[in-house]
Regions:
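Alpha-helical elements of the RecA-like P-loop NTPase motor core of helicases
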Residues: 53, 76-77, 149, 185
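Conserved SAM-binding loop
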Residues: 44, 67-68, 140
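PLP-dependent aminotransferase-like
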Residues: 57-114
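Active-site region of PLP-dependent enzymes
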Residues: 111, 121-191
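Short active-site oxyanion
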Residues: 40-42, 63-64, 102, 136-137
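Conserved PLP-binding active-site segment in aminotransferase class I/II-type PLP enzymes
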Residues: 1-61, 82, 177-191
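Short alpha-helical
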Residues: 28, 50, 73-74, 146
Length: 191
């Protein structure tokens, strides 16, 4: 059961976190996990599949994407929705695989310290059957600052959360793929 955000903030503040806005919780969670994974940046999303979708859209990749034939059903669907073609290959994998030929990695079942591959866009899942069991959620790890900035806006309907809504210029059309502060708080408390 998820606690209301108002009841979670005091728990986080007791642990030394400074919370001025509920979205600060998301930022804290992202920074903690970037450090754990060994990447410069982490961008939380609502699930791993949507994280990979955002990566393909950011890369503007429209070719053929090769993935293992024994992947989760949402992955080939996501590739098609991103404007690419799917090619399956019969290979065994464990924890992590590349969406070839892109630098995007599906690490839905892997979440280990120092796991980040430099130069990659590495996505993980926080489904209740995964290692960090938030219930729903995912993360994109990257060392690319431009990508990081784009992902943060694209995941939240094209909005820049650091700018008041009435002042935001909405320079891109985004998607509703963000992690809620409640999910991030659960992740901090479980991690």
């Amino acid at each position: 059961m998820f606690e209301p955000i108002e009841s979670v903030i005091p728990l986080l503040e007791k642990q030394g976190y400074k919370i001025n806005d509920p979205w600060d919780i998301v930022d804290i969670f992202e920074k903690k996990l970037a450090k754990f994974a060994g990447s410069k940046y982490a961008v939380s999303v609502d699930n791993c599949t949507d994280g990979m979708f955002l990566c393909l859209k950011y890369l503007n990749f429209e070719g053929e994407v090769t993935i293992p034939s024994n992947t989760w059903l949402s992955v080939p669907g996501m590739i098609i929705h991103a404007g690419c073609n799917v090619k399956f290959e019969d290979v065994e994998w464990s924890g992590l695989y590349q969406l070839k030929p892109t630098p995007v990695y599906d690490g839905a079942t892997r979440f280990t310290e120092g796991m980040y591959i430099p130069g990659a866009y590495q996505c993980v899942s926080f489904h209740h059957r995964k290692r960090l069991r938030i219930g729903k959620g995912g993360m994109i790890f990257t060392d690319d600052k431009e990508a990081y900035d784009w992902f943060r806006v694209a995941r939240y309907e094209g909005r820049n959360l650091s700018v008041p809504y009435e002042e935001d210029t909405h320079e891109i059309l985004g998607w509703n793929m963000y992690m809620t502060p409640e999910q991030a708080a659960r992740g901090i408390l479980l991690y």
